[in-house]
């Protein structure tokens, strides 16, 4: 099965030379779905593109006028040629995925009576020096891993015997080398361009608004839930301590999730014995904070007491939810077949 296209070629991409604060990522997520129809299956293709944790493009083949649409103000400045190109690539990807779905139905000996999905994620991570940290080309079929490009950007991992058919095809076409060239060149150039055009949004750091909520479970136990709201970027660390000792195993931690307004939210909870709430503190780390926050639940009259950066020996917490992980949660990896940016991709 052929890899999917990735990200949209732009003419005149800027090769910026400045140093960037932290690492950044460019991701193209897509989902193709086949559904039973009266005479033949119906198909839908949706693609979204992200810089770090910000969606800026979207395409839906079921729209009244299928076209690539802006989802961030800073990309609206692009000219007609950009939109013509990106729409053209998305439509080509949709056609390619439709063919890929049909081939996979045959290879897996499946019926057209059911619904099937083909998902994918492609993109690159850039370090503070502007160089490639890692490239991605991953696919899944019906919610299960299918094939992915390894970290060496030279070899593939196939999930089963059907995926190995695709792997052999990729190897014969030297597709990994072709894609690696794209990642090391154009993908990074696109990312630099987007970061420059959208720097007021993409390179900002909004600190979290944090508080601790108290939820009695019984006369003997209560849940303390530490909330972090309204932060950007998505990377954040929430931990609970009891008398200064981290409660990693006893902490319920949800994945960072979008708030719907361009920021993110997250919570971490612990179950504590009633009457011992003051022994527990929540610790919040985020790049938008001048120093870590420490919060404690006191009483109904003063539910939350934030203490900013207080203990001299407080260890720096290193659990970071990266943009890539957030992205992985948001999509479930897909497989596909398509032409990439400035060149054509092999078919299945």
From Swiss-Prot:
<dbReference type="InterPro" id="IPR011161">
    <property type="entry name" value="MHC_I-like_Ag-recog"/>
</dbReference>
<dbReference type="InterPro" id="IPR050208">
    <property type="entry name" value="MHC_class-I_related"/>
</dbReference>
<feature type="region of interest" description="Alpha-3">
    <location>
        <begin position="206"/>
        <end position="297"/>
    </location>
</feature>
<dbReference type="GO" id="GO:0005615">
    <property type="term" value="C:extracellular space"/>
</dbReference>
<dbReference type="GO" id="GO:0042612">
    <property type="term" value="C:MHC class I protein complex"/>
</dbReference>
<dbReference type="InterPro" id="IPR003006">
    <property type="entry name" value="Ig/MHC_CS"/>
</dbReference>
<dbReference type="Pfam" id="PF00129">
    <property type="entry name" value="MHC_I"/>
</dbReference>
<dbReference type="InterPro" id="IPR011162">
    <property type="entry name" value="MHC_I/II-like_Ag-recog"/>
</dbReference>
<dbReference type="GO" id="GO:0002486">
    <property type="term" value="P:antigen processing and presentation of endogenous peptide antigen via MHC class I via ER pathway, TAP-independent"/>
</dbReference>
<dbReference type="InterPro" id="IPR013783">
    <property type="entry name" value="Ig-like_fold"/>
</dbReference>
<dbReference type="InterPro" id="IPR007110">
    <property type="entry name" value="Ig-like_dom"/>
</dbReference>
<keyword id="KW-0812">Transmembrane</keyword>
<feature type="signal peptide">
    <location>
        <begin position="1"/>
        <end position="21"/>
    </location>
</feature>
<feature type="domain" description="Ig-like C1-type">
    <location>
        <begin position="208"/>
        <end position="296"/>
    </location>
</feature>
<keyword id="KW-0391">Immunity</keyword>
<comment type="subunit">
    <text>Heterodimer of an alpha chain and a beta chain (beta-2-microglobulin).</text>
</comment>
<dbReference type="InterPro" id="IPR037055">
    <property type="entry name" value="MHC_I-like_Ag-recog_sf"/>
</dbReference>
<keyword id="KW-1015">Disulfide bond</keyword>
<feature type="region of interest" description="Alpha-2">
    <location>
        <begin position="114"/>
        <end position="205"/>
    </location>
</feature>
<dbReference type="InterPro" id="IPR003597">
    <property type="entry name" value="Ig_C1-set"/>
</dbReference>
<dbReference type="GO" id="GO:0005102">
    <property type="term" value="F:signaling receptor binding"/>
</dbReference>
<comment type="similarity">
    <text>Belongs to the MHC class I family.</text>
</comment>
<dbReference type="GO" id="GO:0042605">
    <property type="term" value="F:peptide antigen binding"/>
</dbReference>
<dbReference type="Pfam" id="PF07654">
    <property type="entry name" value="C1-set"/>
</dbReference>
<keyword id="KW-0325">Glycoprotein</keyword>
<feature type="topological domain" description="Extracellular">
    <location>
        <begin position="22"/>
        <end position="307"/>
    </location>
</feature>
<protein>
    <recommendedName>
        <fullName>Mamu class I histocompatibility antigen, alpha chain F</fullName>
    </recommendedName>
</protein>
<keyword id="KW-1133">Transmembrane helix</keyword>
<feature type="disulfide bond">
    <location>
        <begin position="124"/>
        <end position="187"/>
    </location>
</feature>
<feature type="glycosylation site" description="N-linked (GlcNAc...) asparagine">
    <location>
        <position position="109"/>
    </location>
</feature>
<dbReference type="InterPro" id="IPR001039">
    <property type="entry name" value="MHC_I_a_a1/a2"/>
</dbReference>
<keyword id="KW-0732">Signal</keyword>
<dbReference type="GO" id="GO:0009897">
    <property type="term" value="C:external side of plasma membrane"/>
</dbReference>
<comment type="function">
    <text>Involved in the presentation of foreign antigens to the immune system.</text>
</comment>
<dbReference type="GO" id="GO:0002476">
    <property type="term" value="P:antigen processing and presentation of endogenous peptide antigen via MHC class Ib"/>
</dbReference>
<feature type="transmembrane region" description="Helical">
    <location>
        <begin position="308"/>
        <end position="331"/>
    </location>
</feature>
<dbReference type="GO" id="GO:0006955">
    <property type="term" value="P:immune response"/>
</dbReference>
<keyword id="KW-0472">Membrane</keyword>
<dbReference type="InterPro" id="IPR036179">
    <property type="entry name" value="Ig-like_dom_sf"/>
</dbReference>
<feature type="region of interest" description="Alpha-1">
    <location>
        <begin position="22"/>
        <end position="113"/>
    </location>
</feature>
<feature type="topological domain" description="Cytoplasmic">
    <location>
        <begin position="332"/>
        <end position="348"/>
    </location>
</feature>
<feature type="region of interest" description="Connecting peptide">
    <location>
        <begin position="298"/>
        <end position="307"/>
    </location>
</feature>
């Amino acid at each position: 099965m052929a890899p999917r296209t990735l990200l949209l070629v732009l003419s005149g991409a800027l090769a910026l030379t400045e140093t960037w604060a932290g690492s950044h990522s460019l991701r193209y997520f897509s989902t193709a779905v086949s559904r039973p129809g009266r005479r033949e299956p119906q198909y839908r293709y949706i693609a979204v593109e992200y810089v770090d944790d910000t969606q800026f493009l979207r395409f839906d083949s079921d729209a009244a006028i299928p076209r690539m649409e802006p989802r961030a103000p800073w990309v609206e400045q692009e000219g007609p040629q950009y939109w013509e190109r990106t729409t053209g690539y998305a439509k080509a990807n949709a056609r390619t995925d439709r063919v890929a779905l049909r081939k996979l139905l045959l290879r897996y000996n499946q019926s057209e009576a059911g619904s099937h999905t083909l998902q994918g994620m492609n993109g690159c991570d850039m370090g503070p020096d502007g160089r490639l940290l890692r490239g991605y080309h991953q696919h899944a079929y019906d919610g299960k891993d299918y094939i992915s490009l390894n970290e060496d950007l030279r070899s593939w991992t196939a999930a089963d015997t059907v995926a190995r058919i695709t792997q052999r095809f990729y190897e014969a076409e030297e597709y990994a080398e072709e894609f690696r060239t794209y990642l090391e060149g154009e993908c990074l150039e696109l990312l630099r361009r987007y970061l420059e055009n959208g720097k007021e949004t993409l390179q900002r750091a909004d600190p979290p608004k944090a508080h601790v909520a108290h939820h009695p479970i019984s006369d003997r136990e209560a849940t303390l839930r530490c909330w972090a709201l309204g932060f950007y970027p998505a990377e954040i660390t929430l931990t609970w301590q009891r008398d200064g000792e981290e409660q990693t195993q006893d902490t319920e931690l949800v994945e960072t999730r979008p708030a719907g307004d361009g920021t993110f939210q997250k919570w971490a909870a612990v179950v504590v014995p009633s009457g011992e709430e003051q022994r527990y503190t929540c610790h919040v780390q985020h790049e938008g904070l001048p120093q870590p926050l420490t919060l404690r639940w006191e009483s109904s009259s003063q539910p939350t007491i934030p203490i900013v950066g207080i203990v001299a020996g407080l260890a720096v917490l290193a659990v970071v939810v990266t943009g890539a992980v957030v992205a992985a949660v948001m999509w479930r990896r897909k497989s596909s077949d398509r032409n990439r940016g400035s060149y054509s991709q092999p078919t299945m």
